[in-house]
Design a protein with these regions (language model features):
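Conserved alpha/beta-domain cores
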Residues: 1-209, 213-215, 227-229
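Gly/Pro- and small hydrophobic-enriched strand-loop and loop-to-helix capping segments
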Residues: 217-233
Length: 233
């Protein structure tokens, strides 16, 4: 039996220690508990321990959970989002971390307009250069800046920052250049697009979140360290 309470306490302590090592306030870091494959009762147990931010990777799976759980949960879409599922995502999620193309932003904007809401989004950036990763390539700054300029014309989508996925590495230190690269990109974009409040850097998961926090993460996406290995559907 996984002891979620003990695991969560350890994660919170590690978040605080990582922030304090670099002179940051731990309160600047939002813990998003990633609940892919975990059932509503597990999420409810975490909710009762004080968690309010939960992340899902798939629209279909989230659809079976969101309505079963308290309304004051903030739901984060942290997985790749297909454009054809944008309407459902607008109904389920409070923020999308994985906007990696203008077409998706346009569809989110359209469905948000129909529902009278504005969706906070993060732009996913492929910092590592791995072909298996989604995201705007960090090396193609012109394409990224053109995309940002276009997304900024959409009234029902609000850019709030950047997200990246680090490569799977044996030593978390090997992920540091990826996290640093995203932070440096954010700083450059803040100069280029001062009208955007670049509030968030969503980066860092179970194996590397402490390094991500040291490099400026404001959102960490953690599943296994809290809930243990993923269950089977």
């Amino acid at each position: 039996m996984v002891d979620i309470a003990t695991n969560l306490q350890r994660v919170r302590e590690r978040i605080a220690a990582a922030a304090e090592r670099v002179g940051r306030d731990p309160a600047e870091v939002t813990l998003v508990a990633v609940t892919k494959t975990h059932p509503p009762e597990v999420i409810r147990a975490a909710y009762e321990l004080g968690l309010r931010h939960f992340g899902e990777n798939r629209v279909e799976e989230a659809a079976g959970k969101v309505g079963e759980l308290p309304e004051d949960i903030t739901w984060h879409m942290v997985g790749h989002l297909q454009s054809r599922k944008a309407a459902r995502a607008v109904d389920l999620f409070d923020i999308v971390h994985s906007v990696d193309r203008v077409k998706l932003a346009r569809r989110l904007d359209r469905f948000c307009a129909a529902r009278g809401r504005t969706m906070p989004v993060l732009l996913e950036v492929n910092v590592s250069g791995e072909a298996s990763k989604y995201g705007f390539p960090i090396a193609d700054r012109d394409t990224l800046e053109a995309a940002i300029a276009e997304i900024l014309t959409l009234p029902h989508v609000r850019i709030e920052g950047l997200m990246t996925m680090a490569p799977i590495v044996a030593d978390p230190e090997d992920a540091r250049p990826v996290f640093r690269g995203l932070r440096e990109l954010r700083d450059a974009l803040a100069t280029r697009f001062p009208q955007v409040e670049w509030r968030h850097l969503s980066m860092g998961m179970t194996d590397d979140f402490e390094v991500a926090i040291e490099e400026g993460a404001t959102i960490v996406r953690i599943g296994r360290a809290i809930f243990g290995p993923r269950g089977t559907r």
